[in-house]
Amino acid sequence: MINEYGTTAAKKEYLKRQFAKVQTPLEYEPSDAFRITGPFAAAYGLLLVLVISFLTVGVFSDEMNSESRFVYYSTKYGPTRGAAAKILAVFIIATMLYWSGMLLMSLMSFGGMGTGGAFASIQTESPYSMYGLNFLERYLLILLSGYVACLFSAGMTLLLFVKTKSAISAMSISFLLFAGLPLLAGNDAFESFRMLTPDRLFHVQDNMNNPCVYQFGTIVCSRVTLLIALYSFLLIPTVVLSYRGFRKGSM
């Protein structure tokens, strides 16, 4: 497996270190609750992306009204502090909605099925996984990855709203980034690209079953790490460009 995915010396060394950290589980403990809740959390997160996109455009809906826009941009701090406050409100709403929704879903799921096997190694389910995590740690990583996806969706919706001046277009295009790109599955020409699309943030559990690694110069990282880092970084320019657009009154 190391020879298959380690196409360079650096990748092979990285895979060796990762597999060396994995401890062979000496006993089995049922972890059905975490195995079921993980994919369900991903699907629920995708639904929250749509809801957050809808609420995001709602925050700036008044600026679509010509009379409201005139008043908003004629004030001293409307184009600056006002725009910044509204953008901040978008991410506060997204954060509160995502974590409250996930907390409620987790309480309902684990309340009914229990939390047995939380500290069991994921190797009991995926023997060839290079991640030395237990089921609880993997679940928390699923939630973190989904949170990054929701923030990125909110940022993209803001940016698209500035450029298209249409709430429907902004929501539709943003949601298609997560729900439409998976339709490329099975097309070999887009396979490498599809593995790094935003929707993969909701496929942490599947990504962990594949020891695929990426190399940038001397830096080697796993797909899960790359996805979280990539879209956390891309969130920054979406916010900056959105702020500049609202500040200039480009709407």
Enumerate the language-model features and the residues they cover.
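Secretory targeting signals
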Residues: 1-63, 84-163, 183, 207-216, ...
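Terminal transmembrane helical anchor/hairpin motif
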Residues: 27, 116-137, 168-172, 177-249
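Membrane-helix interface linkers and caps
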Residues: 64, 70-71
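Transmembrane alpha-helix boundary/hinge residues in polytopic small-molecule transporters
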Residues: 67-68, 155, 171
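Alpha-helical transmembrane segments and their immediate interhelical loop/hinge regions
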Residues: 68, 83-84
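Short helix-to-coil transition segments within interhelical loops
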Residues: 73-79
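Transmembrane helix irregularities
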Residues: 75, 163-164
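Membrane-helix interface/capping residues of multi-pass secondary transporters
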Residues: 79, 166-167
